[in-house]
Amino acid sequence: MCIRDRAGRYPYLKWWERESEDDKRLALDCMEYTGTRELADKPVTEVSGGQKQRILLAKVLAQQTPVLFLDEPTTGLDMVYQEEIFRFARELALMGKTVLMVVHELNLAAKYCGRILLLGEGKLLADDTPERVFTEPLLSRAYAADIAVSRNPLNNNLEITTRVDEASKEKETALLKKICCE
C-alpha cells in the first residue's frame, strides 16, 4: 500500500465505492500541507518515523473531522518536525477545529497551546493557560521532581527544565564510573 492510499478518505467509503477525484485531491492537498506529497507513491515501509507521523496527520486532516485527538504526535520526531506539528495543531485550532494533544514536550506546549490540562498523581491537577499551569509547584508535583520554570531571554517563551541536585549527580556519576570502568 502506498502513502497516497494511507492518506485518503477510505473510512467514509462503502466497501464497493472508490475515492472520487475530490477525495483524491483532498488527500493530496493534506499531504501538501504536511510536506509529504512527494512521498505519495512510496510504499509505507520506505519512509522514516517522522515522515510516518506527518503522513498520519495528513490522513487525519483528510477525514475533515471537527475534533482531532493526537496522542503523542511528536514522538520520534526531530526538533524541527516537533515544532511543525505543534504549529499545525495551533493553525487548525485557530481555524475552529478542536485539537486535543497528549504531549510531553512542555516547552512547545507552552509556546503553541492556549489551554493546558496537567495530569499527575492519577488525576487532573490543573486546567488553564500555560502561564498558570506551568508553574514550578504544579509541575514539580506532577512529575515528582524539582522543576524550574523561567523565561527564555531570546523570545520570552516559558522554558521548563529539571533541576539536578549535586549530591544526586555525584552519586549517579560514581555509579556510572563503576558500571563502565570496572
Question: PLM features: what roles do these ranges have?
Answer:
Residues 136, 140-182:
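ABC ATPase nucleotide-binding domains
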Residues 6, 21-39, 64:
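Conserved ABC ATPase "signature" region
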Residues 68-71:
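Catalytic Walker B motif of ABC-type/P-loop ATPase nucleotide-binding domains
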Residues 109-111:
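A short, surface-exposed alpha-helical micro-motif characterized by mixed small hydrophobic
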Residues 103-104:
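H-loop/switch region of ABC-family ATPase nucleotide-binding domains
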Residues 17, 43-47, 51:
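Conserved ABC ATPase signature
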